[in-house]
Amino acid sequence: YSTIGYCKLQGPLNLVQRNTEPLIIAEFDYESHGLEDPRIVKIEEIYYVTYTAFDGVNALGCLAVSKDLIHFEKKGIIVPTITYAQFNQFTNAKNSANSKYFRYNQHNGMVEQDGKKIFIWDKNVIFFPRKINGKFCFMHRIKPEIQIIVAVTSLTELTAAFYNNYFMNFNDHILLSPKYDHESSYVGGGCPPIETPKGWLIIYHGVKDSIDGYIYSACAALVDLDNPQIEIARLPYPLFSPKKDWELEGEVNNVCFPTGTVVFKDTLYIYYGAADEKIACVSVSLSGLINELMLNTKKNDN
């Protein structure tokens, strides 16, 4: 099963260390079938590593924290553990979820598998790299849209009661919805947000169904610095899509899945999973990307 490894780069591309042993492994039942898609940010001297844990039935967002990237304390599942019936009940109370949510998340009507309750899959948990107005903020994804949790002073606030109210007002927490052809099936988080003078740069993934199956592309959007629920701009085309042989064919075909970035001067390097088999990198001018986004602001939409 999947584990989280460690490597070290000198500069953006020169690999100088790759550990032979996993950095984070499964210890609990909720992650017994793998730990996937890690993202990492540093907030006030603490590293926050979010990942998707799979127990053979459910895939849910989890958190581990560290001060030194050697010793990690697992905080467990931080997304709601909610069944389809509960999701339906809460969101229907105020008509706050579109019909696509129910098509993607009903698990063919099953409520239990292998003796475990089936929960709504909630993945792609990604923290903003600093507190906003003194509070934590993170993205997560229940198909087909990217949602956002804003204004949590402490992660201990993420209780069942908190999430019950969250789902009662679900529409208020939608960050990005599928909009263009390349993301017409669903969208999901990619890299930790990058702070720029124009707003938070969000590199995410968009998915389109095709005759050859789903195609995963990297996408870009810009949201407000003080209120990240406000979308400023979005590229109407993929930032990059599967083109190379090793992106088109692999464990999962047709996948470019961005999860990390680094900025050197004006160059943004984006690290991504290629066909679920390889780690690859692309680069783009950061200022050029922001300028292109500003040509595609919401007010300029046709």
Residues of each region from the PLM?
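Beta-rich carbohydrate-recognition and catalytic domains
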Residues: 1-33, 42-125, 130-185, 195-251, ...
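Short glycine-rich, acidic/polar surface loops and turns
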Residues: 246-248, 256-260
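Beta-rich, blade/repeat-based domains predominating
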Residues: 38, 125-129, 190-191, 258-263
